[in-house]
Amino acid sequence: MQPLQIAPCRLLYGLYRGLKSPASTGTRICPAMARPSSNMADFRKLFAKAKHIVIISGAGVSAESGVPTFRGAGGYWRKWQAQDLATPQAFARNPSLVWEFYHYRREVMLSKEPNPGHLAIAECEARLREQGRRVMVITQNIDELHRRAGTKNLLEIHGSLFKTRCTSCGIVAENYKSPICPALSGKGAPDPEAQDARIPVEKLPRCEEAGCGGLLRPHVVWFGENLDPAILEEVDKELTLCDLCLVVGTSSVVYPAAMFAPQVSARGVPVAEFNMETTPATNRFRFHFQGPCGTTLPEALAPHETGNVS
């Protein structure tokens, strides 16, 4: 399979080509604007007139469904943080351990449901489509909760827990098996005292394409890997065309996604941030609404009594 390479996008800034944390970039988001507003009525006026809305979502949206974020205090699986296991190097060293981690995450997700934030976004997209308006969701999440909520216009820039990619033939396929292979049944416990399963590589998930049988890996973007250039081209197009942008449940610290909304704001497009706390990018935006996305988004995206305000 050919390695992922960055696309030459207008808006997607050569420095931030792979999945990176702020420590690895040493970069600050550009200087601040005036203090953002929390006036919902003002936001609703802009929302009523917007024709092309981009919603950028992150882990905070799914956290309200009980999805582990593996960030901050207590953000460990066994003794590991996500960035310890979500790398090509970790998979090459110990594919059994990495597959245990992703098996655990897959099994957790099978018990979770979209929350009111996901549902508000999906309902808004469907309603605005009938009005000839467009909503595009660009998510950093790999849990498919937006898809399960009913969102149709969706770019999953970091991949999906429920897709695999063959390390031999490169085939990408949906995979909702539980467990994904017999050897992982009952494995993946997150307890720090749990013993690593040490599953032989031949017993790990394997490609089912005729004549292949190669080792499968999760079809997600790991730290140090480039994002899919075709998806980045789509992101570039959406960010260029949008006339309103929402940033929901994202910490604005993982690049390149951390640059998406500030770049939109820099060209004068209103950006509204919905988050439990401020982020390094908050003062770059027109609005900031603090609180659970499952509470703030249904209010922000609710239908107007008179439909689209002209």
From Swiss-Prot:
The keyword Transit peptide applies. Its EC number is 2.3.1.-. Substrate binds at Y102, R105. Residues 37-307 form the Deacetylase sirtuin-type domain. GO terms for biological process: protein demalonylation; protein desuccinylation; regulation of ketone biosynthetic process. Transmembrane segments: none annotated. It catalyses: N(6)-malonyl-L-lysyl-[protein] + NAD(+) + H2O = 2''-O-malonyl-ADP-D-ribose + nicotinamide + L-lysyl-[protein]; N(6)-succinyl-L-lysyl-[protein] + NAD(+) + H2O = 2''-O-succinyl-ADP-D-ribose + nicotinamide + L-lysyl-[protein]; N(6)-glutaryl-L-lysyl-[protein] + NAD(+) + H2O = 2''-O-glutaryl-ADP-D-ribose + nicotinamide + L-lysyl-[protein]. NAD(+) binds at residues 58-77, 140-143, 249-251, 275-277, 293. Gene3D superfamilies: SIR2/SIRT2 'Small Domain, TPP-binding domain. Keywords: Cytoplasm, Metal-binding, Mitochondrion, NAD, Nucleus, Transferase, Transit peptide, Zinc. GO terms for molecular function: NAD+ binding; NAD-dependent protein lysine deacetylase activity; protein-glutaryllysine deglutarylase activity; protein-malonyllysine demalonylase activity; protein-succinyllysine desuccinylase activity; zinc ion binding. Residues 1-36 form a transit peptide. GO terms for cellular component: cytosol; mitochondrion; nucleolus. Its cofactor is Zn(2+). Monomer. Homodimer. Interacts with CPS1. Interacts with PCCA. NAD-dependent lysine demalonylase, desuccinylase and deglutarylase that specifically removes malonyl, succinyl and glutaryl groups on target proteins. Activates CPS1 and contributes to the regulation of blood ammonia levels during prolonged fasting: acts by mediating desuccinylation and deglutarylation of CPS1, thereby increasing CPS1 activity in response to elevated NAD levels during fasting. Activates SOD1 by mediating its desuccinylation, leading to reduced reactive oxygen species. Activates SHMT2 by mediating its desuccinylation. Belongs to the sirtuin family. Class III subfamily. In contrast to class I sirtuins, class III sirtuins have only weak deacetylase activity. Difference in substrate specificity is probably due to a larger hydrophobic pocket with 2 residues (Tyr-102 and Arg-105) that bind to malonylated and succinylated substrates and define the specificity. This is NAD-dependent protein deacylase sirtuin-5, mitochondrial. It comes from Canis lupus familiaris. The gene is SIRT5.
